[in-house]
Amino acid sequence: EYGRSVIFQYYSVSKMADDCVRAYDDAYCETHGRRILMSGYYGFNNSGDEAILTTIYENICKMDKNIHITVLSRDPKETTQKYGFKDVVSRFDFFKVLYEIKKCDILLSGGGSLLQDTTSTRSLMYYLFIIEWAKIMRKKVMLYANGIGPVSRDHNRKMVKRVVSKADIITLREEDSKKELEAMGIPGDRLFVTADPVFTMSSVTEERAERLIFEAGIPSDKGLIGISVRNWKNDEDFIQKFADICDRIHDEFDKNIVFIVMHNPNDKDISECVMSMMKNKAYILDKNYSPKEIMGMIGKMDLILSMRLHTLIFATKQRVPIVGFAYDPKINSYLKLL
């Protein structure tokens, strides 16, 4: 468990917003005011990235309600309806994106693991292009609590170094990300390690969380073990082993197994595959919950086993014990912090 002093030092709202405020002050423009453009993996039904979006947005508004924020999203309509944001534009509308970059005073890129080529080189190039174009238009750029890597291809590493070096402020969510950028040739004195923004997010009330669990048809006769699983190399043997682990936990601890869908429909599909191979009955939370609702429900569980980083962070915030499955370096990096 984190000590209170560590929480206050690294994860308070004021700490997480402080770097942003520094960037805003530099970007201030008397004619247009402060205009912020947020770029990230938003609008893809990924609860971790949606938590990052809402937390950054809320933290900025707490610091200065007069700041105008525009969000780039895959699904502007859903992002607007779900969170009530005023200005959301499609990240795929090329000319609209360029127009928003031109209007803004500062670009916030992140957080999350945007700069990696495990997903695809195309995804990496998209985020680098946004940063590059902002600098061409002489805008201030801040990498906000980014997780860096893995970036495996030599050409991609050179591109990351070239583009990221142009950013005005670079903040990272863990020490390993700093080491990765240093290995690419970016000086360490330009890199600031903070933490994932989601550490400042609050959950729904206990009463609301209990109600959501009840409405999902999960019985309250036993304690709950939360499972967060994601696709991994289409390995059927992996699915069977995960099912065996869940059955063993169910039998040895006499707890109900509850699968937590963090990225719909991907996580739902793999969760249902694992459930189908289990000997015992399991349950699933697969509705379109908000990040705060998921965090609240996790707070009612006795243990979390997760391949998803933000499931682990939600549990840590709720003081629920965790077991992380390190399919990606970011999981290892997080577990080393605990």
Q: For each predicted feature, which ranges?
A:
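A short, well-ordered alpha-helix in the C-terminal region of glycosyltransferases
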Residues: 1-10, 18-22
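Active-site anion-handling motifs in enzyme catalytic cores
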Residues: 12, 29-338
